[in-house]
Amino acid sequence: GKTYVAALMAKALKDAGLNAAYYKAAVSGNVRRPDGSLIPGDARFVREFAHLDQGEETMCPYVYEHAWSPHLAAQAEGNPPELPVIQKGFQAVCQQHEIVTVEGSGGILCPLRHDEKEKLWLEDVVQQLGLASVIVAHAGLGTINSVVLTAEYMRANGLAVKGIIF
């Protein structure tokens, strides 16, 4: 759901005449090219759907093969996310584009890195990049409670929630 909504948002911005871009700190569950490099699947989908003029290599600094939570994929693949790398990539995209749609890597409390050296959560990325959020949720049983808890957690921790999409 998040990737589809991000693609719709990026497309709407591009169709409105803005130099729009997309960014995601970490993406897991990707397939390999014949040369062994990973294809950032979510980034590719958004780029193609929204017709963005942006190279895939600028869209996501951490790309993992295993379809696991980013912190587990990072541990298994030996490439843990570093906040300065995420910030630098985001700033570079912002310098080249008028507006950037940022997709979360999981929910607000999803760990991107959780090892003996550092604990990095999606919440940290949202705070450090100064982002406002739109919560994207499935319209299923139990979702209202989950969304309200997420929104209240975010507000209590100073994170702006601009909307909710079911």
Q: PLM features: residue spans?
A:
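Conserved catalytic-core segment of NTP-binding enzymes
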Residues: M9, I99, G104-F166
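N-terminal phosphate/diphosphate-binding loop that engages ATP/GTP or pyrophosphate donors
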Residues: Y4-P80, P84, G89-A92
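Glycine-rich phosphate-binding loop signature in dinucleotide/nucleotide-binding domains
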Residues: V93-E98
